[in-house]
Design a protein with these regions (language model features):
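Juxtamembrane or sensor-core-proximal signal-transducing alpha helices
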Residues: 141-155, 180-186, 204-236
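N-terminal, Lys/Arg-enriched amphipathic/low-complexity engagement segments
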Residues: 42-46
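Alpha-helical membrane-embedded segments
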Residues: 135-140, 168-175, 196-216
Length: 258
């Protein structure tokens, strides 16, 4: 396998990573449809991604963005179909799933490239073992993180502003992480293969950190709002109770005077 082949992450790495990333979201959220429909939808989505990404692997820079738009659309429709989300919430979780998948595929292939470089050979069985082990570790951690974000909150309501924030973050992360692949002579592009891998992986990891930090912030703001709303309702009920009690006392006093 040549250096050029090693530099280009295979399409099926991304197809598997996107699928697993979306599965993490689906199986930590409330479902819109039954288990069998979700299973069928998972299979259809995976097959579509696998075929499309193998077909578009190594596509020209002109068609790169349209190809990514197709992939993102497939992921969005799959999440919306399976989860009890509004379109805004589906978009919010899609952005997280997409960047998570980008990081997983990038890190997994970088790790395999590192092994090939150290051993000075390409061993297919190690490629499979590496893929299974790295993906299992990454998505197990992401699953636990998503489950922890569900604590104390049944449903996360996303506003247009919050959706736009994560879209802008993801677009910036994706653009910066792919600069070296689209233009290796650019101002912010890496020259060596490992430099390119490091830039992409670290940028994707940073994007994940920012998105999860923002998710936590959105959750805390919503929890604070719900607590304040509940406190106001309880306060109003208490005031109404006090008024009712005072009215009853006045009526009783009048009856007593009579």
């Amino acid at each position: 396998m040549s250096t050029q082949d090693l530099m280009n992450t295979p399409g099926y790495y991304y197809a598997i990573a996107y699928t697993l990333s979306v599965l993490v979201i689906i199986y930590t959220q409330e479902h819109r449809v039954g288990k069998w429909k979700i299973l069928i939808s998972n299979i259809v989505q995976f097959v579509l991604l696998m075929l499309f990404m193998q077909w578009t692997h190594g596509v020209s820079r002109t068609l790169f963005i349209p190809a990514m738009a197709v992939i993102i659309t497939v992921l969005l429709l799959h999440i919306y179909y399976c989860c009890r989300f509004s379109w805004r919430e589906a978009g919010f979780y899609l952005v997280k799933a997409f960047i998570n998948g980008e990081f997983a595929a990038s890190f997994c292939w970088q790790f395999y490239y590192y092994i090939c470089e150290k051993m000075n050979t390409h061993i297919p069985i190690w490629q499979i073992v590496n893929l299974v082990a790295v993906y299992a570790a990454i998505f197990a951690v992401l699953y636990l993180m998503e489950k922890s974000l569900q604590k104390d909150m049944d449903e996360l309501h996303i506003t247009k502003r919050e959706l736009m924030v994560v879209v802008v973050i993801a677009a910036a992360v994706f653009a910066v992480s792919n600069l070296s692949f689209l233009d290796q002579k650019g101002l912010f592009s890496g020259r060596l293969v490992m430099d390119i891998f490091i830039i992409r992986t670290l940028v994707d990891l940073s994007g994940m950190a920012v998105l999860y930090a923002y998710h936590i912030q959105v959750k805390e703001v919503q929890l604070r709002f719900e607590k304040n709303t509940l406190h106001n309702i309880m306060d109003m009920q208490y005031q109404n109770y006090q008024l009712s009690k005072e009215s009853m006392d006045m009526v009783n006093q009048k009856y007593h005077d009579l």
